[in-house]
Amino acid sequence: MNLNATILGQAIAFVLFVLFCMKYVWPPIMAAIEKRQKEIADGLSSAERAKKDLDLAKADAGEQLAKAKAEAQAIIESANKQRTQMIEEAKAEAEQERSKIVAQAQSELEAERKRAREELRKQVAMLAIAGAEKIIERSVDEAANSDIVDKLVAEL
């Protein structure tokens, strides 16, 4: 055989092989490659969407945390105001109670003073009556009478 015929035979066999591969082997390989490219592209887009969703979730979580902190601060401030108000009310109530007790003590003291004065008046009246009885019993001169009156005044 000659070298040209061998090369020609090999060239024909190669062309037939290439045609066979293009017709039966190449389309499934290309379909698999395209399918894989599509899966990779879908995976990348899913990853990108997931990243965006994660960023949105982080932002939302940050907003919710800030809102919760603000609400907690408002609750704390409200509780402090309520506590202060309750303390002030308790102080006012205690002051009223103290004033009431002081007023009651003063009225009791005044009543005791009046009772003591009344008792003293009764004693003075008794002394005056006793002194008058002594003066009447002792008919003495005017100097003795004046002396007895001075003693009564000193006793009062």
Curated annotation (Swiss-Prot):
Record-level GO cellular component terms: plasma membrane; proton-transporting ATP synthase complex
Topology class, membrane: Single-pass membrane protein
Transmembrane segments: 11-31
Keywords: ATP synthesis, Cell inner membrane, Cell membrane, CF(0), Hydrogen ion transport, Ion transport, Membrane, Transmembrane, Transmembrane helix, Transport
Record-level Gene Ontology MF annotations: proton-transporting ATP synthase activity, rotational mechanism; proton-transporting ATPase activity, rotational mechanism
Domain of life: Bacteria
Subcellular location: Cell inner membrane
Predominant localisation class: membrane
InterPro entries documented for this protein: ATP_synth_B-like_membr_sf, ATP_synth_b/b'su_bac/chlpt, ATP_synth_F0_bsu_bac, ATP_synthase_B_chain
SUPFAM superfamilies: F1F0 ATP synthase subunit B, membrane domain
Function of the protein: F(1)F(0) ATP synthase produces ATP from ADP in the presence of a proton or sodium gradient. F-type ATPases consist of two structural domains, F(1) containing the extramembraneous catalytic core and F(0) containing the membrane proton channel, linked together by a central stalk and a peripheral stalk. During catalysis, ATP synthesis in the catalytic domain of F(1) is coupled via a rotary mechanism of the central stalk subunits to proton translocation.
The protein's assembly and partners: F-type ATPases have 2 components, F(1) - the catalytic core - and F(0) - the membrane proton channel. F(1) has five subunits: alpha(3), beta(3), gamma(1), delta(1), epsilon(1). F(0) has three main subunits: a(1), b(2) and c(10-14). The alpha and beta chains form an alternating ring which encloses part of the gamma chain. F(1) is attached to F(0) by a central stalk formed by the gamma and epsilon chains, while a peripheral stalk is formed by the delta and b chains.
Similarity field: Belongs to the ATPase B chain family.
Protein name: ATP synthase subunit b
Gene: atpF
